[in-house]
């Protein structure tokens, strides 16, 4: 009996020591944010900043893209394979230019607003009222940016034929809609 108690005691001590070592290691592990404190805008990576300034989509239009609403930049890339008419290509280019111009302007506003939020935290001048105002403004800007990209996808849906949309999805590597998915709306676009 004493031998069993001795072995159990050693096992318990060993487990406690291992847990203590693991807890210590966790305390000294660097944060996944380590190094990000040197960013010009703490909340944005260099890539995100560049994408915002360039008017790129950044995944904001995935709800459209993955539900059979093609994006104008990819429609332009696939123009030959989609057999776009000259009129379709022209309208697609125009839609892309409008979207990109609006997205660039909103992106620049987002960066400015993120810098402002960063500054009030860095200087210790943030308070609840300021936080509420600034985050609401950022939320509105991000919403405008997303709406800008989504609207361009809606425009493409009205411009392309159902066959072109199906070809687009195939060329982009998307599978057919699942059987339970809502049917694609009828296309009454201008061709």
Positions of PLM-derived features:
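N-terminal secretory signal peptides that target proteins for export/translocation
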Residues: 1-7
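Bacterial N-terminal signal peptides
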Residues: 9-20
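Sec/Tat signal peptide C-region and signal peptidase I cleavage site
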Residues: 21-25
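Charge-rich (acidic/polar
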Residues: 26-191
């Amino acid at each position: 009996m004493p031998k069993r108690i001795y072995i159990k005691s050693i096992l318990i001590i060993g487990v406690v020591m291992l847990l203590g070592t693991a807890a210590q290691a966790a305390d000294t592990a660097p944060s996944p944010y380590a190094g990000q404190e040197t960013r010009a805008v703490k909340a944005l990576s260099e890539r995100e900043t560049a994408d915002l300034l360039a008017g790129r989509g950044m995944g904001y239009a995935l709800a459209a893209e993955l539900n059979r609403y093609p994006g104008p930049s990819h429609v332009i890339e696939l123009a030959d394979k989609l057999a776009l008419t000259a009129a379709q290509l022209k309208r697609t280019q125009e839609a892309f230019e409008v979207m990109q111009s609006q997205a660039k302007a909103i992106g620049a506003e987002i960066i400015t607003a993120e810098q402002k939020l960063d500054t009030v935290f860095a200087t210790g001048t943030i308070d609840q009222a300021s936080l509420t105002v600034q985050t609401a403004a950022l939320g509105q800007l991000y919403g405008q940016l997303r709406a800008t990209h989504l609207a361009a996808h809606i425009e493409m849906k009205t411009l392309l034929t159902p066959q072109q949309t199906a070809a687009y999805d195939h060329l982009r590597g998307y599978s057919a809609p699942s059987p339970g998915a809502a049917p694609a709306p009828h296309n009454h676009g201008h061709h």
